[in-house]
Structures are given as structure tokens and as C-alpha cells.
Amino acid sequence: MSLPPEKASELKQLIHQQLSKMDVHGRIREILAETIREELAPDQQHLSTEDLIKALRRRGIIDDVMKELNFVTDSVEQELPSSPKQPICFDRQSTLKKTNIDPTRRYLYLQVLGGKAFLEHLQEPEPLPGQVCSTFTLCLHYRNQRFRSKPVPCACEPDFHDGFLLEVHRESLGDGTRMADSTTMLSISDPIHMVLIKTDIFGETTLVASYFLEWRSVLGSENGVTSLTVELMGVGTESKVSVGILNIKLEMYPPLNQTLSQEVVNTQLALERQKTAEKERLFLVYAKQWWREYLQIRPSHNSRLVKIFAQDENGINRPVCSYVKPLRAGRLLDTPRQAARFVNVLGYERAPVIGGGGKQEQWCTLLAFLCRNKGDCEDHANLLCSLLLGYGLEAFVCVGTKAKGVPHAWVMTCGTDGAITFWESLTGHRYIHKPTNPDEPPVAEQPKPLYPYRTIGCVFNHQMFLGNCQPSDAVETCVFDLNDESKWKPMSEEAIKSVCAPGATTSLPPFPPLCASTIDASVTSNEIEMQLRLLVSEHRKDLGLTTVWEDQLSYLLSPALASYEFERTTSISAGNEEFQDAIRRAVPDGHTFKGFPIHFVYRNARRAFATCLRSPFCEEIICCRGDQVRLAVRVRVFTYPESACAVWIMFACKYRSVL
């Protein structure tokens, strides 16, 4: 529903007043602090956490608190990015939902209280009510918890005002049900990973910044409250350039019975940094020695793509094995092939580079890749390998080249029977590898490879790294017996474990869990279909043609679209016979039927329509001339985790042939 600008402005003001009356942040402070601390008499303030909980249970206060502790959070925080998102207007009231908080657990309340010095947006005009504009969204991950801020208009001083309640707990040693004390929390080295995403007016996403927040300074602050100024740096080639500043406030709930001295906190952090630096130094020394030995096998190895380290979005060199980890998708993905389809529908985009030259290297951390919903081939391969490892397969990322020597990464799985399967993460295609023998006589028939890969330099996963030391690095002649050290030179698994195992170093970004889609497939399918009908009608009107839609014919296209997606997910074709039979019955004798299916991984109808018109066959259908022309279009959106989606569109027409 569109509103006049004056009405939209009035509605926006009323919403703002109502949210101010609710005082969300104040309610969090008052209920937790007063209920848990001030309800006890002053002489009992020395009680331990266990005694405090027992006293609250005896008095029945916990039951009351569980009923009363309802905090209002914006449901947009729980949404995940998609590619692309619908443009955002700022004259609509957000949907609010309530969340319960357990007063027996320890929480870190992180507030983002505005931003400043985002100088790239210095001249950005303030958006008018109802105007579509570019937005910033802040995504957070901490110990398997993910959050997302409300989108705010891009500005020099973006109006971030969000609060995130992060549960702090130990997940092992039987401490999962105990409230963490200061000493326990000091030993939890996981940082808070913050990713800033920009979404333009067309729904395209850009990674602006990726920052790891060290939150434990709050443990040495008075009353467990501290304020920080976080300077966000750019990504890739701009990783040394400041993009903006965020004002952040950290509070512990319930308040700490005992705060640590700042000196103790600083000493712990310094010790962790020192241990991490020493482990990384020792691994670097080992990697150099391994590389020297690899070159001594054959000097030509120097030209092979043996990738031991790779730069992340912040320009930090990390061992490639740290980009992969067994990842379980819970109930979001059922099979390895469905996982491959999910990775395939995430957008592909090479890292941006300023000026000409070669490819810019940027292997994104998993959170940055998921929040942006697109990345390079290495990002896709790392995610697919992690998911396949989670399904119990022996999976590796392969680094090599495609045709014309273009660097590329893909995934390989090794079966228990020795079968080697390549998985192309950008398309979801699978290829069986059967090596050719270069010593066979020319007359011998050799299997022709169907895969697009030409050379392979190394393979790796979270535990192993192996360099290809066979006489030729051509994939078609490669033997993938990874236990044969005459063909594959391994790195020490202990050395890899020292820097890549979970918790081995504090510099390792933790892996976030996948989140379910927030897209309503039926609603989105219908919206895109209606937009395409309008675009087709306008296009035909410009050509002087009338448009008559046939709803029944449109409906009959649905089984075909479902069949196409099923085939992409399972590699099995099904249901085509019923579709063809239905179409034959729907098209009268003497009439001609034409259909054009096409697949996208974005939900922008206008962009999809422009792409379709570039196909001569599709243009022939859309611009069909003849007797009794009836047009049909069907859209089917298939949703996947992280709000990724596969969009299938089929245009069709039937007309009476006049010759």
C-alpha cells in the first residue's frame, strides 16, 4: 500500500514515538538487574551464584521472571541476507516479536549506538519517506549464535541503534548448565565476528567490512559495562583504509559478582596473542621447509598451483586448511547433492580489483560469504567441501586451472572403493574421474574427460594438505592415490592441526551455523510472475500487439519447473511424460506450442526479463504474432538456507499456424 509523502511522514513519526515509549534497552537493564540483584537484601550481596539461584527458586521469583522477561526485538534481526533482497522503504512499521530470556544464564548485551565517519557517503542525501535507498546491515556471529541488524540508510553517520543479546557459556566439561563466572568467561577466546553489508537500490550486496571484536575487556570494567569505538577497515585491496566507525556498548547480564582487574584481562589477551604468534611462526618455518623439499623433487613444480596460504577479506594470510571444517546443516539440507545445489545457487562474483592486471585474491571467511550471498569459486569450493565433510564423505578442495590456464578451485570426494568424483561448486555438476594412461599406444581408446579442469597443483581439507608431485599435473592423467607419497607429497597432519584445529589459535574465525530461509516461496513466486506478466504486456504493447494470458496453460507449466529443479538436486529426471501429455491435451489440433525455461539465482524480475529477451527463442515467444495467440508464464522459486533461492521461469505460447 503506497501512502502520500505527508501521511508516510506522519506514520513514521508515530512509530518512532511508540518505540521510544517502550524503552526496550531500559527494560532489559531494569528487569535483569533489579530482579536478580536488588530483590535480595543488601547483606546477602556476597552470596555465590548458586546460592542466588536457589534463593530465587525458593521464592518463586524465577517463575515470575520467566513470565515477565519479554524483550521486544525487531524480527528483521533474525532475517538472513539474500541475493538480491527487495529494496527497502523506510515508511513501514516493522513486525515485532517477543523473545524469552533465561535468567540462569550469563549474557553479553551488545548495543550498536550509531556510526560516524563513513566518508564515502558524505554527500548522501537523507532519504525521503517511502524512497528506495541503499542500506547498511550489520551481521554478527558469536558461538553458534547469529544476529542481523535492521537495515539503515547509507549515510556518513548511519543511524544504527540495535541491541543483541549474546549468550556466554561453556559447551563442554559439564559446564553447559552453569552460569559462567568471570574467570570462565576470560578463558572463552571466541571473538564476535561483525560483517557490514551494503545493499544497493537494485538489491545487490557488497561486503563493506569484516571485524573481529574482542569483547573480554568488559570483564575488567566497573559494573561490567564498557563503551568502545570500533574502526572498521575496508576489504581486499582496501583493507588498510578506514571505512567508518561504530560506537559500541557492552554490558554483562546479570551483573558480575566479581570483576577482574584490567591487568589480569590484558595479561590473558597478551598471552593468547603470544601463543598464537608462536604457533603461526613455527608453521611458517615448516611450510617453507616443505616447499623447498617439494621443489627439489622437480624444479618445474615451481609453476604449479600449490596454494599453502591464502588472503582473507582483511588481507591476512592464513593456511588454506583453516578455510575448511566439517559443517553440519542440521535439518536444512538432507543430502550431499542437495548441499551442492545450495552452494551452486549462491551467487558467483570475482573479488573486485581496481585497475587492470590479474585476478584479485580474496578467500572470504564463511560468515562474510554467507552474509553477502555471493563469492568467488574458492568460497564456493570451501563451503561445499565443508558440507560434504559434514556428511561423512572424504572430501578435498582441489586447486588448479581450467581452460586457458585460468586458476580455479573445485571439490573432490574419494569413495571407499577408490572412485574419484569431482564436484563443480559453481554449477552443482558432478564428474567421475577416470585417469588416462599417457604410456598407452595411440591406437588404444582413452576415456574422454567431460570435466572442464586442466591441471591440478594440490588438494586439501581441514586435516590434510597434499602437493601433486606426479610428472604431469594434467588432471586427465592424474592418479588420485593420496596415500602414495611418490605421487602426492603430504604435509605433516600435526603441523596442520597446530594452527587449523578448532581452538588451536585465537586468530581462527569460528564457523557460523547455517540459517533457514526467510523467503516465502509461494508468495515470492507469485510476485515475480505478476511482475513478468506486466513486463510482457508492456513490451508487446510497445510493438502494437495485444496480450491474452491463459491461466490454465500457465498452471500446466508447473510440473516441468519442479522436474527441472528435482533433476538439479538429484541428477534424476522425472515427471516429463506427464507434462508432455498435459500439453498435448491443452493444445488443439492445428495449433503450435512453444516453451522456453530458464533459471536464475536472483529474484529481480526486470533483470530476468531483460536477460530472457536476449535469447532469440524466448523473444520469439514473447513477441509471438499469429492467430489465436495465447501466452503463459510460470515462476517457481525454490528456497535454500541463507535465503538463497533457485528461480525457474518458463515462458510459453500457443497459436494457430497459418501458412
Curated annotation (Swiss-Prot):
<dbReference type="GO" id="GO:0032991">
    <property type="term" value="C:protein-containing complex"/>
</dbReference>
<comment type="subunit">
    <text>Interacts with CCP110 and CEP97.</text>
</comment>
<protein>
    <recommendedName>
        <fullName>Centrosomal protein of 76 kDa</fullName>
    </recommendedName>
</protein>
<dbReference type="InterPro" id="IPR056290">
    <property type="entry name" value="CEPT76/DRC7_peptidase-like_dom"/>
</dbReference>
<keyword id="KW-0206">Cytoskeleton</keyword>
<feature type="modified residue" description="Phosphoserine">
    <location>
        <position position="83"/>
    </location>
</feature>
<keyword id="KW-0963">Cytoplasm</keyword>
<dbReference type="InterPro" id="IPR038765">
    <property type="entry name" value="Papain-like_cys_pep_sf"/>
</dbReference>
<dbReference type="InterPro" id="IPR056289">
    <property type="entry name" value="CEP76_N"/>
</dbReference>
<dbReference type="GO" id="GO:0005814">
    <property type="term" value="C:centriole"/>
</dbReference>
<dbReference type="GO" id="GO:0005829">
    <property type="term" value="C:cytosol"/>
</dbReference>
<dbReference type="InterPro" id="IPR052299">
    <property type="entry name" value="CEP76"/>
</dbReference>
<dbReference type="GO" id="GO:0005813">
    <property type="term" value="C:centrosome"/>
</dbReference>
<dbReference type="GO" id="GO:0046599">
    <property type="term" value="P:regulation of centriole replication"/>
</dbReference>
<dbReference type="Pfam" id="PF24656">
    <property type="entry name" value="CEPT76_peptidase"/>
</dbReference>
<comment type="similarity">
    <text>Belongs to the CEP76 family.</text>
</comment>
<dbReference type="InterPro" id="IPR028926">
    <property type="entry name" value="CEP76-C2"/>
</dbReference>
<dbReference type="Pfam" id="PF24652">
    <property type="entry name" value="CEP76_C"/>
</dbReference>
<dbReference type="InterPro" id="IPR056288">
    <property type="entry name" value="CEP76_C"/>
</dbReference>
<feature type="modified residue" description="Phosphoserine">
    <location>
        <position position="75"/>
    </location>
</feature>
<dbReference type="Pfam" id="PF15627">
    <property type="entry name" value="CEP76-C2"/>
</dbReference>
<keyword id="KW-0597">Phosphoprotein</keyword>
<comment type="function">
    <text>Centrosomal protein involved in regulation of centriole duplication. Required to limit centriole duplication to once per cell cycle by preventing centriole reduplication.</text>
</comment>
<dbReference type="Pfam" id="PF24654">
    <property type="entry name" value="CEP76_N"/>
</dbReference>
